[in-house]
Amino acid sequence: MEVGGIQALRRWRAEQSGRVGLVPTMGALHSGHQALMTRARAESDLVVASIFVNPLQFGADEDFVQYPRPIEEDLKKCEEAGVDFVFAPALAEMYPSAPEVRVVAGRMGAVFEGAARPGHFDGVLTVVAKLFTLIDPDVTVFGLKDIQQYVLVKRMIADLNFDIELIGLPVVRDADGLAMSSRNTYLAPEDRARALAIPRALNAAAEVAERGRGTAGSGAGAGAGGAGAAAGSGGAGADLPAAVEAAALAELEPAAERGELEIVYCNLVEAATLRPCPPGFTGPALLLVSATVGGTHLIDNLPLEF
């Protein structure tokens, strides 16, 4: 496995032939990232993983400086996953000066995470576009935990005519149901226990959707509480999307009232547009959930079919 910045990448890339897969990361890798690398290996002859903590996607009050950078551990995980080249550029290589030209995420980048973190997705898409240009992959693999990011990258690939196949991997969860995230390392034990309200909310919503339509995306791996049953009484009615959303909120709101978390958003949206699902909606949808627990910003989601 080779490791290097832009010049090393260009030399390595010029010597290679075959299908190249890319897994973009910000480091602090866990088994969810390794699952992305394993999938990229299955789809490609060569795998590149990028490790770059991108300052453009952090807000002024966010944790860019404190963001974990365990590079030696990350390299070991990349090697275990069969990565061929780790692209780990210095900040000055990627941004010799403050970029004047950036990718603008548009309407879909200004809602939900984009509303909570203004400019976040402009920064994400800018660095992803740079990675696509530098690495020239044939396929790229993203996790679906950051589902809004996935939707925007998919749209950018189409709008900017990148000839790249995009693959999304389902959310990888710990045994307790919490979605794997590098930010989970910030959670104190008591906060992690409180954060389990998020997968419980998704499971409650999934139960209501299943009762209302008979089909739904898989749950979040943790037992749903009684709120799903309470909210489910209206699940078979005309406005199933509203009942699904209400079931999730019925799990989250009591925790918020107890001061265990702060709800940032909990909304059911059309998967293709990220617009709210209207009454009687049919088609693929996403339940998007975000909460702040002990000062840590967490996101999760549930795909559903109506």
What do these predicted ranges mean?
Residues 1-219, 226-261, 269, 273, ...:
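Nucleotidyltransferase catalytic core that binds NTPs
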Residues 259, 280-283:
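A structural signal for short secondary-structure junctions
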Residues 46, 284-286:
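Structural motif
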